[in-house]
Amino acid sequence: MLQTSSSSATASLQQQLSKQYANSFSNDGSSFSSKNNQQYSEIVNYISFNQDASCITIGLKNGYKIFNCQPNFGRSFQFKNDESTGIVEMLYCTSLLATVAQGEEIGSSPRKLKIINTKTKSTICDLIFPSTILQVKLTNTRLIVVLEDQIYLYDITTMKLLHTIETSPNLSGLSAISYDDSNSYLAYPSPPKTITHDSLLASGINTNGGSNSTQNNISSVSNTPNRVGDVIIFNLTSLQPISVIEAHKSTIASMAFSNNGLYLATASDKGTIVRIFEVATGTKLYQFRRGTYPTKIYSLRFSADDKYVLATSSSLTVHIFRLGEEEALETKHKKKKIPAVATILEEETEGSQSNEQTKSIKRNSEEFEDIRDDGDDSDVDDEDGDIDDESLEVIPAKQRKLSQGSTNSYTSVNSEDVQSNSPKTEPLIDQNRLSMARIIRRSSQTLGRKAAQKMGDFLPSRFSSILEPTRNFASLKINAHSKDTKSVAVMNNVLQQDLIPQTYLASDNASAKQDFMEVSLFHIYVVTTEGMLYTYGLDPERGGDCILLNSHCILDEY
């Protein structure tokens, strides 16, 4: 809830925040200048957060850097040399570090993994692999090295090779690791071929991952040829595959485990749908629509409390999806009520199928094609990029139906109680993003949404969920110079008191009684390949547009 602050003790802080806020959106002489961003984007090879999101690692053309980002921002380690670093990964906040060179210089190789002690600045060991190292992950017990067609598993305490997994070509080295000691898993894309009964039984894999899975479950996979969107779950403790999750029908682009290792988030190369599965059973718990137009998902990450999922994309936005009771009920409602043809159509928005299936879908669901395109111009080439359909016009909470509340995802899980005590339940709106393109698009989308709601009152319930897809709870726009900027994001679960300018939210500046407001926010940290660290604030009760709190150029000398 927003509160105004008039204490004289905060005057200096307010002045500092005002200056910082103004600089954040300046195009001249600030850390966001085009010249600086172009320069930094050319030297950043790799960006990553460590396992608990307390540190940032940056791979550079001339070495690497490590920064603390929680509780306070600051550089903790820097190594400079003439070798370009392609991968740099930490083991939590310990002195153990894994690095891989780009191989651009004479004598360096992208096939060599170095395990380094940052305290002594010494190399513990070197490991040479048969092909280029694409990804490296560290847990308390395992070292995982991903190549294009192999995954190597080591005991991190002895550096002994425990197991080697032969995989289908994995050009990006896509994988996900669960860091929980009780649920230590590895996820990687399944081979894009028909899986037979014999191969499943021989390797101990079943489609549901449960001990009571039936032969019908296996045949459901084996009867689906050339699947490329399946994910294999591998137990890092027993060194055995335990299940196959049918995540998408097109190629997997990104995935991430929850912090407790119980859930897996996935997105395909289409970039329109984000799904959350239960690892133990393979059951789909949540399904969110990020947008209608295709985009590249760079990363998925659960919040520290596993109640939110963050998705960064090539549209320079970060979407935050809430894993609440309403969203779970909405996904369950869709699963039960949507007819088979609609389910197929939902899958078809992500990938392509055979000509026969495509023709069948067009014949049976032609009338639904327009309403399935829900109007999220998330990747339209304008300055605003992704927006929420309802972010600028909100229906009073008491008039919302369950499906609509889940669709907008703007109320808290216990929204009824919160709304009864506070009139300010509408989502936050960033006045700085109110461009003409966004206003026009909002008008057309709101009209479409109202029409869908009216139609939903007259149509059977199985069609209403088609008209109202589950959307993100909040989003933010990255103020990047280049459209090719990549980003990763994390979110903590500690509410912090922040002062933000009243003009950030007030549409009428004259009506603002105070210059600043005190807001309770979750902090979201976003690192980009332009060498910037952004801190945004998320209102957990209202959602909507996240608030830019501060920024740091992490490549500047200190």
Swiss-Prot record:
Topology with respect to the bilayer: Peripheral membrane protein
Gene Ontology CC annotations of this record: cytosol; endosome membrane; fungal-type vacuole membrane; PAS complex; phagophore; phagophore assembly site membrane
Keywords, sorted A to Z: Autophagy, Endosome, Membrane, Protein transport, Repeat, Transport, Vacuole, WD repeat
Residue ranges of WD repeats: 247-287, 292-331
Keyword Endoplasmic reticulum: no
Keyword Repeat: yes
Primary localization: membrane
Similarity field: Belongs to the WD repeat PROPPIN family.
Entry protein name: Autophagy-related protein 18
Naturally occurring in which organism (per UniProt): Candida albicans (strain SC5314 / ATCC MYA-2876) (Yeast)
